Amino acid sequence: MGLLTVLKKLKQKEKELRILMLGLDNAGKTTILKKFNGEDISTISPTLGFNIQTLMYKEYKLNIWDIGGQKTLRSYWRNYYEENDAVIWVIDSSDIRRIDDCKFELKKLLEEEKFAGASFLVFANKQDLDGAMTSEEISKYLDLEQLNTHHWEIMSCSAVTGLGLEEGIDWVVKDIVSRCFVLD
């Protein structure tokens, strides 16, 4: 293998990003990925364990790990904490009764040293439903303004309509690239 081939492989590897997608069960993590990938979203079942979706976005290969959010699976989340460039936390904006549970799990997640420096996107999902909290309300309730350990953004979205999905992924990729790569 020649030096040029090795350099090309290294360059391709640089353009590969690992993103961890977490949130409580029924937040819409799998639906977001399927919608973004142009797949059918009419029959989604709960994720038992994890799914890995590889998406091409601009010139980047995104390996997105979608981890089930059921209470019985949350203790296993830490098995996926290594070497992530970003975390996407998905919230069901219409499920006000579980916002305290969401805040508790998010706080534990943000205390993990393995995520230090990772880009952090909160998708305020299900904005298409009546009574959904706004991204501003969620940000305030979750105290995101106090978050100074990560680059972060909150984005309103709907996995059903596609609202905000591309903008969110675009922010994640740009934030990772601005921190990790020297632009050509």
From Swiss-Prot:
One of its GO terms (molecular function) is GTPase activity. A lipid is attached at residue 2 (N-myristoyl glycine). The keyword Metal-binding does not apply. GO terms for biological process: protein folding; protein transport. May be involved in trafficking events within the endosomal system. Belongs to the small GTPase superfamily. Arf family. This is ADP-ribosylation factor-like protein 2. It comes from Dictyostelium discoideum (Social amoeba).
